[in-house]
UniProtKB/Swiss-Prot annotation:
GO terms for biological process: tRNA wobble uridine modification. It catalyses: 5-methylaminomethyl-2-thiouridine(34) in tRNA + selenophosphate + (2E)-geranyl diphosphate + H2O + H(+) = 5-methylaminomethyl-2-selenouridine(34) in tRNA + (2E)-thiogeraniol + phosphate + diphosphate; 5-methylaminomethyl-2-thiouridine(34) in tRNA + (2E)-geranyl diphosphate = 5-methylaminomethyl-S-(2E)-geranyl-thiouridine(34) in tRNA + diphosphate; 5-methylaminomethyl-S-(2E)-geranyl-thiouridine(34) in tRNA + selenophosphate + H(+) = 5-methylaminomethyl-2-(Se-phospho)selenouridine(34) in tRNA + (2E)-thiogeraniol; 5-methylaminomethyl-2-(Se-phospho)selenouridine(34) in tRNA + H2O = 5-methylaminomethyl-2-selenouridine(34) in tRNA + phosphate. Its EC number is 2.9.1.3. One of its GO terms (molecular function) is transferase activity, transferring alkyl or aryl (other than methyl) groups. Involved in the post-transcriptional modification of the uridine at the wobble position (U34) of tRNA(Lys), tRNA(Glu) and tRNA(Gln). Catalyzes the conversion of 2-thiouridine (S2U-RNA) to 2-selenouridine (Se2U-RNA). Acts in a two-step process involving geranylation of 2-thiouridine (S2U) to S-geranyl-2-thiouridine (geS2U) and subsequent selenation of the latter derivative to 2-selenouridine (Se2U) in the tRNA chain. InterPro entries: Rhodanese-like_dom, Rhodanese-like_dom_sf, SelU. Belongs to the SelU family. Transmembrane segments: none annotated. NCBIfam families: PRK11784.1-2, PRK11784.1-3, tRNA_sel_U_synt. Residues 14-137 form the Rhodanese domain. The gene is selU. This is tRNA 2-selenouridine synthase. The active site is at 97 (s-selanylcysteine intermediate).
């Protein structure tokens, strides 16, 4: 078994999107894995738990023996068929378990005996995860970061689509970063969020990029937490402020969080099932702000929202939503933003309308390319 191939070129695995077969238990895969990995576990969650208990009570030899009993005979044959089928689809796939130990060694040997020899990843999941954490830490420390900020509804996410050096943190988190930021389909685990972000930065730095623009975010984007080194770098980074009138921002919010999001719910769940989910999404998002708004303001906003939802349900129009959106900006989001910006004015390097900010980013990018 010791003569079967190992690979430790972790950078190449992620730069080339090498397919991976994850041999850990399903519960381990759910907590975090890698974008190009497929879960084909050696043991189920229950089998793994039994082996773990045996190890604690009777030691390693007994645990290994139990593992072979649980995954033997027809069970072994069935799982071997699954690994072989996957390797027929992805013949260059690599094998890994948690530490690159017995589980991946066992499967590698069984595959070898079946006539297929594939490398396993030295150090397994733990080593690959450490590599990606280090990648994030180095990017935070070594790259030049600029933060795009602006009042709620300024369309910052849309602006970044036109910025060459942009990194879409909210895209990786599958969340728009506010009380109303939840998207249908849920969020990735925090580990998966970090892994995808690290792989993007690894690839882009490998191509020679070292300056990035991100949207102003709190530490939490929904349930996804920004890595401490990256968040710290963002808190010290130069700021570009985009100025957009409130009426335009209210319209942008109506478009993004009402019109477009309803279409996403409708596409995912159908109109009949999707409507109550969409209405609950808006109502619940506002309810999460109740403590900060106060009871009276929350009641007023909720009444306006329910009127708008009723009209949307009856006629399909969404213009009534502008009433509660504008009031929420006036009462909550705009004052909060102005207070926060007042604490970091010394970091502002540019301020202007959307196109002026986009031109600034383009000029910065061109200057770095020439330099």
């Amino acid at each position: 078994m010791s003569q079967l191939p190992l690979t430790s070129d972790l950078a190449r695995i992620f730069l080339d999107d090498v397919p991976l077969i994850d041999l850990r238990a399903p519960i381990e895969f759910k907590e975090g894995a890698f974008p190009c990995s497929t879960s084909l576990p050696l043991m189920t969650d229950d089998e793994r738990a039994q082996v773990g208990t045996c190890f604690k009570q009777r030691g390693q030899a007994a645990a290994i023996e139990l593992g072979h009993q649980l995954v033997g005979g027809a069970v072994r044959a069935e799982r071997l068929d699954g690994w072989l089928a996957q390797l027929r689809k992805q013949p260059d796939a690599l094998l890994y378990c948690f530490r690159g130990g017995l589980r991946s060694q066992t499967v590698q040997l069984w595959l070898h005996e079946a006539g297929v020899t594939r490398p396993r990843v030295a150090g397994g999941y733990k080593e690959m995860r450490r590599f990606l954490i280090d990648t994030l830490d180095k990017a935070a420390a070594e790259c030049h970061w600029t933060v795009l900020t602006g009042m709620t509804g300024s369309g910052k996410t849309h602006m970044l689509e036109h910025v060459t050096q942009a990194v879409d943190l909210e895209g990786h988190a599958h969340h728009r970063g506010s009380s109303f930021g939840q998207l249908p389909g849920g969020q990735p685990s925090n580990i998966n969020f970090e892994n995808k972000l690290a792989i993007e930065l690894l690839k882009r730095r490998h191509q020679g990029e070292h300056a990035f623009v991100v949207e102003d975010e709190s530490r939490l984007i929904g349930r996804c937490c920004l890595p401490n080194p990256l968040f710290d770098a963002m808190c010290e980074a130069p700021l570009v402020v985009v100025d957009v009138p409130q009426s335009e921002r209210a319209e942008q919010i109506r478009q993004d969080y009402v019109h477009d999001l309803w279409l996403r719910y409708q596409a995912m769940f159908g109109a009949e099932e999707g409507w109550p989910l969409f209405a609950a999404y808006l109502t619940d998002a506002l309810a999460r702000l109740k403590r900060r708004l106060g009871d009276q303001a929350h009641r007023e906003l909720d009444q306006l929202m329910q009127i708008a939802l009723a009209e949307q349900a009856n006629s399909g129009t969404t213009e009534r939503h502008l009433a509660w959106i504008t009031l929420l900006l006036t009462r909550y989001y705009d004052p909060m933003y102005l207070y926060q910006l007042g604490n970091k004015r010394e970091r502002i390097v540019f301020r202007g309308e959307k196109q002026a900010c986009l031109d600034f980013f383009a000029e910065q990018h061109a200057a770095r390319q020439q330099g």
